[in-house]
Swiss-Prot record:
Domain of life from the UniProt record: Bacteria
Keyword annotations: Ribonucleoprotein, Ribosomal protein
Biased amino acid composition, Basic residues: 9-22
GO biological process, one term: translation
InterPro entries per the UniProt record, alphabetical: Ribosomal_bL34 (IPR000271), Ribosomal_bL34_CS (IPR020939)
Molecular functions per Gene Ontology: structural constituent of ribosome
Record-stated family: Belongs to the bacterial ribosomal protein bL34 family.
Any GO CC annotation of this UniProt entry: ribosome
Protein name: Large ribosomal subunit protein bL34
Region Disordered, residue ranges: 1-26
Length: 44
């Protein structure tokens, strides 16, 4: 039987990648908050 919870990089990038975040105002807020907090990785 096949495991279903592998996760795919295409889906991951498309939903929570940098360009996906920049596409919406709320996503831009997320990036801004992570910059302010000093996160090394801003997005996936």
């Amino acid at each position: 039987m096949q495991r279903t919870l592998g996760g795919t990089n295409r889906k991951r990038k498309r939903t929570s990648g940098f360009r996906a975040r920049m596409r919406t105002p709320d996503g831009r807020n997320v990036i801004r908050a992570r910059r302010k907090r000093g996160r090394h990785r801003l997005s996936v």
